[in-house]
Protein backbone atom coordinates (compact mmCIF):
# COMPACT_ATOMS: atom_id res chain seq x y z
CA UNK A 1 0.00 0.00 0.00
CA UNK A 2 1.26 3.46 -0.91
CA UNK A 3 0.48 6.22 1.64
CA UNK A 4 -0.38 9.70 0.53
CA UNK A 5 1.50 12.57 2.21
CA UNK A 6 -1.48 13.54 4.37
CA UNK A 7 -1.93 9.94 5.53
CA UNK A 8 1.78 9.68 6.31
CA UNK A 9 1.59 12.79 8.47
CA UNK A 10 -1.48 11.52 10.29
CA UNK A 11 0.14 8.16 11.08
CA UNK A 12 3.32 9.89 12.22
CA UNK A 13 1.34 12.01 14.67
CA UNK A 14 -0.49 8.93 16.00
CA UNK A 15 2.78 7.04 16.38
CA UNK A 16 4.46 9.97 18.16
CA UNK A 17 1.56 10.44 20.58
CA UNK A 18 1.49 6.72 21.31
CA UNK A 19 5.22 6.62 21.95
CA UNK A 20 5.10 9.62 24.26
CA UNK A 21 2.13 8.13 26.05
CA UNK A 22 3.94 4.85 26.67
CA UNK A 23 7.06 6.71 27.77
CA UNK A 24 5.00 8.74 30.20
CA UNK A 25 3.38 5.58 31.52
CA UNK A 26 6.81 3.97 32.02
CA UNK A 27 8.05 7.05 33.86
CA UNK A 28 4.97 6.98 36.08
CA UNK A 29 5.57 3.31 36.92
CA UNK A 30 9.24 4.01 37.76
CA UNK A 31 8.26 6.98 39.93
CA UNK A 32 5.69 4.83 41.71
CA UNK A 33 8.33 2.19 42.46
CA UNK A 34 10.65 4.86 43.86
CA UNK A 35 7.84 6.17 46.07
CA UNK A 36 7.13 2.64 47.30
CA UNK A 37 10.83 2.09 48.09
CA UNK A 38 10.99 5.41 49.93
CA UNK A 39 7.87 4.52 51.90
CA UNK A 40 9.39 1.14 52.80
CA UNK A 41 12.53 2.90 54.04
CA UNK A 42 10.44 5.13 56.32
CA UNK A 43 8.41 2.22 57.69
CA UNK A 44 9.83 1.10 61.06
CA UNK A 45 11.62 -2.23 60.75
CA UNK A 46 11.42 -4.87 63.49
CA UNK A 47 14.47 -4.98 65.73
CA UNK A 48 16.88 -7.92 65.78
CA UNK A 49 15.29 -9.72 62.81
CA UNK A 50 17.80 -10.66 60.11
CA UNK A 51 17.06 -10.30 56.39
CA UNK A 52 19.34 -10.83 53.35
CA UNK A 53 21.14 -7.75 52.04
CA UNK A 54 22.97 -9.25 49.06
CA UNK A 55 22.17 -12.22 46.86
CA UNK A 56 23.66 -15.61 47.67
CA UNK A 57 27.10 -16.54 46.34
CA UNK A 58 28.20 -13.07 45.27
CA UNK A 59 31.21 -13.48 47.58
CA UNK A 60 33.43 -16.50 48.21
CA UNK A 61 33.25 -18.67 51.31
CA UNK A 62 35.96 -16.37 52.68
CA UNK A 63 33.58 -13.42 52.99
CA UNK A 64 34.78 -11.28 55.90
CA UNK A 65 35.31 -7.66 56.81
CA UNK A 66 32.87 -5.87 56.99
CA UNK A 67 33.08 -2.09 57.49
CA UNK A 68 31.09 1.01 56.49
CA UNK A 69 32.39 4.27 55.06
CA UNK A 70 30.99 7.72 55.82
CA UNK A 71 28.59 7.51 52.85
CA UNK A 72 27.04 4.30 54.18
CA UNK A 73 28.62 1.84 51.74
CA UNK A 74 29.56 -1.54 53.16
CA UNK A 75 32.85 -3.22 52.27
CA UNK A 76 33.67 -6.92 52.61
CA UNK A 77 36.56 -9.03 51.38
CA UNK A 78 36.59 -11.73 48.71
CA UNK A 79 33.94 -10.49 46.32
CA UNK A 80 33.48 -13.06 43.49
CA UNK A 81 37.00 -14.39 44.11
CA UNK A 82 39.71 -14.33 46.75
CA UNK A 83 42.04 -11.31 47.17
CA UNK A 84 39.40 -8.71 46.37
CA UNK A 85 37.24 -6.23 48.25
CA UNK A 86 33.61 -5.71 47.30
CA UNK A 87 31.49 -2.61 47.83
CA UNK A 88 27.79 -2.95 48.70
CA UNK A 89 25.17 -0.20 48.91
CA UNK A 90 22.62 -0.11 51.71
CA UNK A 91 20.12 -1.50 49.18
CA UNK A 92 22.29 -4.53 48.47
CA UNK A 93 23.83 -3.64 45.10
CA UNK A 94 27.29 -5.23 45.10
CA UNK A 95 30.30 -4.64 42.87
CA UNK A 96 34.06 -5.11 42.85
CA UNK A 97 35.83 -2.27 44.63
CA UNK A 98 39.50 -3.20 44.41
CA UNK A 99 41.86 -6.08 43.73
CA UNK A 100 44.50 -6.62 46.40
CA UNK A 101 48.18 -7.10 45.45
CA UNK A 102 49.43 -10.55 44.47
CA UNK A 103 50.04 -12.68 47.55
CA UNK A 104 47.57 -10.73 49.71
CA UNK A 105 44.22 -11.95 51.04
CA UNK A 106 42.07 -9.68 53.14
CA UNK A 107 40.20 -10.44 56.33
CA UNK A 108 39.16 -7.72 58.80
CA UNK A 109 38.55 -4.15 57.58
CA UNK A 110 38.51 -0.90 59.56
CA UNK A 111 38.17 2.79 58.72
CA UNK A 112 39.91 5.69 60.43
CA UNK A 113 38.11 8.94 61.17
CA UNK A 114 40.00 10.40 58.21
CA UNK A 115 38.42 7.84 55.88
CA UNK A 116 41.44 5.57 55.43
CA UNK A 117 40.66 1.90 54.95
CA UNK A 118 42.85 -0.62 56.76
CA UNK A 119 42.81 -4.31 55.84
CA UNK A 120 44.29 -7.29 57.68
CA UNK A 121 46.20 -9.29 55.04
CA UNK A 122 46.58 -12.74 56.54
CA UNK A 123 48.57 -14.35 53.72
CA UNK A 124 51.02 -11.47 53.28
CA UNK A 125 51.55 -10.83 57.02
CA UNK A 126 50.58 -7.21 56.38
CA UNK A 127 48.20 -4.51 57.41
CA UNK A 128 47.25 -2.75 54.19
CA UNK A 129 46.06 0.81 53.69
CA UNK A 130 43.62 1.61 50.87
CA UNK A 131 42.92 5.11 49.56
CA UNK A 132 39.16 5.13 48.99
CA UNK A 133 39.31 7.80 46.29
CA UNK A 134 42.20 6.48 44.20
CA UNK A 135 41.94 2.81 45.26
CA UNK A 136 45.69 2.74 45.71
CA UNK A 137 46.79 -0.09 48.03
CA UNK A 138 49.94 0.30 50.13
CA UNK A 139 51.49 -1.62 53.01
CA UNK A 140 51.11 0.21 56.32
CA UNK A 141 52.86 -2.51 58.33
CA UNK A 142 54.61 -5.81 57.64
CA UNK A 143 55.71 -8.28 60.28
CA UNK A 144 57.03 -11.74 59.41
CA UNK A 145 56.47 -12.90 62.99
CA UNK A 146 52.72 -12.53 62.55
CA UNK A 147 50.97 -15.88 62.10
CA UNK A 148 48.15 -14.38 60.06
CA UNK A 149 46.66 -11.01 61.04
CA UNK A 150 42.97 -11.72 61.30
CA UNK A 151 40.84 -8.86 62.58
CA UNK A 152 41.49 -5.20 63.36
CA UNK A 153 40.20 -2.54 65.69
CA UNK A 154 41.12 1.11 65.93
CA UNK A 155 41.66 3.19 69.06
CA UNK A 156 40.79 6.89 69.53
CA UNK A 157 44.43 7.91 68.89
CA UNK A 158 44.36 6.21 65.48
CA UNK A 159 46.52 3.22 66.35
CA UNK A 160 45.37 -0.25 65.34
CA UNK A 161 45.24 -3.54 67.21
CA UNK A 162 45.38 -6.80 65.27
CA UNK A 163 44.44 -10.30 66.39
CA UNK A 164 46.84 -13.01 65.26
CA UNK A 165 45.74 -16.63 65.71
CA UNK A 166 47.77 -19.77 65.04
CA UNK A 167 45.02 -22.25 64.18
CA UNK A 168 47.32 -25.26 63.99
CA UNK A 169 48.66 -24.78 67.51
CA UNK A 170 45.44 -23.23 68.86
CA UNK A 171 47.36 -20.24 70.17
CA UNK A 172 47.38 -16.55 69.43
CA UNK A 173 48.77 -13.11 70.13
CA UNK A 174 47.93 -9.42 69.71
CA UNK A 175 49.80 -6.63 67.91
CA UNK A 176 49.61 -2.86 68.04
CA UNK A 177 50.31 -0.85 64.88
CA UNK A 178 50.89 2.89 65.25
CA UNK A 179 49.95 5.44 62.60
CA UNK A 180 53.45 5.34 61.12
CA UNK A 181 53.32 1.56 60.71
CA UNK A 182 55.41 0.66 63.74
CA UNK A 183 54.51 -2.82 65.02
CA UNK A 184 54.63 -3.88 68.69
CA UNK A 185 53.70 -7.25 70.18
CA UNK A 186 51.35 -6.47 73.07
CA UNK A 187 49.97 -9.86 74.18
CA UNK A 188 51.25 -13.45 73.89
CA UNK A 189 50.40 -16.95 75.17
CA UNK A 190 46.74 -16.60 74.31
CA UNK A 191 44.27 -18.92 72.62
CA UNK A 192 43.10 -18.42 69.03
CA UNK A 193 42.62 -14.65 69.14
CA UNK A 194 39.99 -13.48 66.69
CA UNK A 195 37.39 -10.71 67.09
CA UNK A 196 38.52 -7.62 68.95
CA UNK A 197 37.19 -4.17 69.77
CA UNK A 198 38.09 -1.03 71.73
CA UNK A 199 35.54 0.32 74.22
CA UNK A 200 33.80 3.68 73.63
CA UNK A 201 36.09 5.46 76.13
CA UNK A 202 39.20 3.98 74.52
CA UNK A 203 40.40 2.45 77.79
CA UNK A 204 39.56 -1.23 77.28
CA UNK A 205 40.42 -3.74 74.56
CA UNK A 206 38.13 -6.75 74.19
CA UNK A 207 39.26 -9.89 72.38
CA UNK A 208 37.70 -13.31 71.91
CA UNK A 209 39.34 -16.70 71.44
CA UNK A 210 37.49 -18.80 68.86
CA UNK A 211 38.50 -22.31 69.89
CA UNK A 212 38.63 -21.70 73.65
CA UNK A 213 35.32 -19.71 73.57
CA UNK A 214 36.62 -17.02 75.93
CA UNK A 215 36.05 -13.27 75.86
CA UNK A 216 38.82 -11.25 77.53
CA UNK A 217 39.26 -7.61 78.47
CA UNK A 218 42.54 -5.68 78.80
CA UNK A 219 43.18 -2.23 80.19
CA UNK A 220 44.89 -0.02 77.59
CA UNK A 221 47.67 2.10 79.09
CA UNK A 222 48.49 5.67 78.08
CA UNK A 223 51.22 4.29 75.79
CA UNK A 224 48.92 1.75 74.15
CA UNK A 225 50.21 -1.29 76.02
CA UNK A 226 47.85 -3.92 77.47
CA UNK A 227 47.59 -4.89 81.13
CA UNK A 228 45.12 -6.27 83.70
CA UNK A 229 43.90 -9.15 81.53
CA UNK A 230 40.58 -10.48 82.83
CA UNK A 231 38.03 -13.03 81.66
CA UNK A 232 34.55 -11.57 81.23
CA UNK A 233 32.75 -14.54 79.68
CA UNK A 234 33.33 -18.20 78.80
CA UNK A 235 30.82 -19.86 76.50
CA UNK A 236 30.01 -23.59 76.67
CA UNK A 237 29.74 -24.28 72.94
CA UNK A 238 30.37 -23.08 69.38
CA UNK A 239 33.09 -20.75 68.19
CA UNK A 240 33.54 -16.99 67.88
CA UNK A 241 34.54 -14.73 65.05
CA UNK A 242 34.16 -10.95 64.60
CA UNK A 243 33.05 -8.62 67.39
CA UNK A 244 31.93 -4.97 67.57
CA UNK A 245 30.66 -2.47 70.17
CA UNK A 246 27.63 -0.23 70.16
CA UNK A 247 27.76 3.29 71.62
CA UNK A 248 26.83 1.95 75.07
CA UNK A 249 29.75 -0.47 75.07
CA UNK A 250 27.68 -3.61 74.53
CA UNK A 251 29.47 -6.26 72.48
CA UNK A 252 27.97 -7.95 69.43
CA UNK A 253 29.78 -11.26 68.86
CA UNK A 254 29.33 -13.57 65.87
CA UNK A 255 28.82 -17.22 66.91
CA UNK A 256 30.50 -19.21 64.15
CA UNK A 257 28.84 -22.62 63.85
CA UNK A 258 25.73 -21.59 65.75
CA UNK A 259 24.47 -19.07 63.23
CA UNK A 260 23.77 -16.27 65.67
CA UNK A 261 25.05 -12.94 66.94
CA UNK A 262 25.14 -12.47 70.71
CA UNK A 263 24.57 -9.07 72.30
CA UNK A 264 26.47 -8.95 75.60
CA UNK A 265 27.24 -6.30 78.20
CA UNK A 266 30.89 -5.46 79.03
CA UNK A 267 30.37 -7.41 82.26
CA UNK A 268 29.46 -10.59 80.35
CA UNK A 269 25.66 -10.60 80.70
CA UNK A 270 23.89 -11.97 77.62
CA UNK A 271 21.14 -9.57 76.56
CA UNK A 272 19.89 -11.43 73.48
CA UNK A 273 20.88 -13.78 70.67
CA UNK A 274 19.95 -13.06 67.05
CA UNK A 275 19.73 -15.78 64.34
CA UNK A 276 21.39 -14.58 61.12
CA UNK A 277 20.08 -16.92 58.37
CA UNK A 278 23.24 -19.00 58.10
CA UNK A 279 25.35 -21.19 60.36
CA UNK A 280 28.69 -19.42 59.85
CA UNK A 281 28.57 -15.67 60.51
CA UNK A 282 32.12 -14.37 60.27
CA UNK A 283 31.99 -10.70 61.25
CA UNK A 284 29.78 -7.70 61.90
CA UNK A 285 29.70 -3.92 61.57
CA UNK A 286 27.19 -1.09 62.00
CA UNK A 287 25.93 1.49 59.54
CA UNK A 288 22.81 2.93 57.96
CA UNK A 289 21.60 6.54 58.25
CA UNK A 290 21.25 6.28 62.03
CA UNK A 291 23.96 3.73 62.77
CA UNK A 292 21.35 1.20 63.89
CA UNK A 293 21.71 -1.33 61.08
CA UNK A 294 23.99 -4.28 61.75
CA UNK A 295 25.62 -5.90 58.72
CA UNK A 296 26.88 -9.47 59.06
CA UNK A 297 29.12 -11.39 56.67
CA UNK A 298 27.71 -14.91 56.40
CA UNK A 299 29.89 -17.68 54.97
CA UNK A 300 27.37 -20.48 54.44
CA UNK A 301 25.48 -18.59 51.75
CA UNK A 302 28.39 -16.25 50.88
CA UNK A 303 26.41 -13.07 51.40
CA UNK A 304 25.68 -10.15 53.71
CA UNK A 305 22.65 -10.10 55.97
CA UNK A 306 21.32 -7.20 58.02
CA UNK A 307 19.20 -6.50 61.07
CA UNK A 308 18.10 -3.41 62.96
CA UNK A 309 19.32 -2.71 66.50
CA UNK A 310 18.18 -0.37 69.27
CA UNK A 311 21.41 1.65 69.67
CA UNK A 312 23.97 2.90 67.11
CA UNK A 313 27.29 1.22 66.51
CA UNK A 314 30.43 2.78 67.91
CA UNK A 315 32.26 3.04 64.57
CA UNK A 316 29.26 4.82 63.02
CA UNK A 317 29.21 7.34 65.89
CA UNK A 318 32.85 8.20 65.25
CA UNK A 319 31.97 9.19 61.68
CA UNK A 320 29.63 11.84 63.09
CA UNK A 321 32.38 13.66 65.00
Regions found by a protein language model. Name each.
Residues 76-96:
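Beta-propeller domains
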Residues 37-59, 229:
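A short helix->beta-strand "capping" segment at the edge of beta-propeller domains
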Amino acid sequence: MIMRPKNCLRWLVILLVGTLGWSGFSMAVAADKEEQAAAADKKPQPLFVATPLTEKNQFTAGIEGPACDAAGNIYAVNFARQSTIGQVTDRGAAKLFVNLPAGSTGNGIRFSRQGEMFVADYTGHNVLRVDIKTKKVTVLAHEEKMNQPNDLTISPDGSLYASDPNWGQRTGQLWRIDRQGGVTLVATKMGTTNGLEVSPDGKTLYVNESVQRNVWAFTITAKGQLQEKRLIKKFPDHGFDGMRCDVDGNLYITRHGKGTVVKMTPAGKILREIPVLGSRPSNICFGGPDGCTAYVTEMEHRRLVQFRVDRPGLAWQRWQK
